[in-house]
């Protein structure tokens, strides 16, 4: 799917979420694009890489392969299955693992749950103060630990810019 096609298909969900929450639709679209590779991989309508919790019902979760960047090689207990662990030049560790993620009946369900996540978790309080600015929100969400990728904020900001350029 091209960026223009992605925007056309998923912008209505992002705009509706922005209307309800004040979170910039540009940020929402950028995060969905980043997490899915512009909808190349959307297992279980999961657009935002949201992990399943301990209390997530079995029918609402799926076991998927993912990459995590962590500070210790001794965190294998965090995952149902560890495929590999490699030390990076930064001193951090790249884990290739299987982990539980949420799944949704519809794309809209994924977009709605994603927005609620920010309001339900105190770590995003500072981010919510700047939720109308997609660039600042991306910075704060990354600082709060949404993802383990060290370049998460800069990746989001590049995609926000690409969406702005293709959003005509």
What function would you assign to each model-found segment?
Residues 1-168:
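Catalytic cores of secreted/periplasmic lytic hydrolases that degrade extracellular macromolecules
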